[in-house]
Curated annotation (Swiss-Prot):
PROSITE patterns: RIBOSOMAL_S11. The keyword Acyltransferase does not apply. Located on the platform of the 30S subunit, it bridges several disparate RNA helices of the 16S rRNA. Forms part of the Shine-Dalgarno cleft in the 70S ribosome. SUPFAM superfamilies: Translational machinery components (SSF53137). This is Small ribosomal subunit protein uS11. GO terms for biological process: translation. Pfam families: Ribosomal_S11. One of its GO terms (molecular function) is rRNA binding. Belongs to the universal ribosomal protein uS11 family. It comes from Ruegeria sp. (strain TM1040) (Silicibacter sp.).
Length: 129
C-alpha cells in the first residue's frame, strides 16, 4: 500500500495595498504579525523563528530582524501602507517599529493596545540578583 504523493499548495501572491502590523513584545520574545484590514494573516515572524535562543530573543536587535523578515514577506504580497498596533512591555517595541519604517512601509498610525489590569492578577515578585 504505497501512499499517494500529496502536493502542498504554495501560498498564492495576494495583492493587498494596506495592512495592520501587530507587534507583540513580551519580556521574553517579540512577535510580529502583518495582516490585512480584516485581520487575515499575511505574514508573521518572531525573534525565536529568526534563530535567537534564550535571553537573546528579548533584545531589540532580534525584534528588528523579525520585523524585517515579516515586512519583506508582506511586501511580496503587495502591502505598502501599514497601521501599527504595539502590545506589551518588552524592549523590542521601538526597534521593530523603526525596522518596519526603514524597509519602506508608509506607516499611517501607531496604536498602543497593551491591556491594563484594573487590579487583576498579582504580578510576579521582583528579582533579587
Amino acid at each position: 500500500m504505497a501512499r499517494d504523493k500529496t502536493r502542498t499548495k504554495r501560498k498564492e501572491r495576494k495583492n493587498i495595498a494596506s495592512g495592520v502590523a501587530h507587534v507583540n513584545s513580551s519580556f521574553n520574545n517579540t512577535k510580529i504579525l502583518i495582516s490585512d484590514v480584516q485581520g487575515n494573516a499575511i505574514s508573521w515572524s518572531s525573534a525565536g523563528t529568526m534563530g535567537f535562543k534564550g535571553s537573546r530573543k528579548s533584545t531589540p536587535y532580534a525584534a528588528q530582524m523579525a520585523a524585517e523578515d515579516a515586512g519583506r514577506k508582506a511586501q511580496d504580497h503587495g502591502v505598502k501602507t501599514l497601521e501599527v498596533e504595539v502590545q506589551g512591555p518588552g524592549s523590542g517595541r521601538e526597534s521593530a517599529l523603526r525596522a518596519l519604517a526603514a524597509i519602506g512601509f508608509n506607516i499611517t498610525n501607531i496604536r498602543d493596545v497593551t491591556p491594563i489590569a484594573h487590579n487583576g492578577c498579582r504580578p510576579p515578585k521582583r528579582r533579587r540578583v
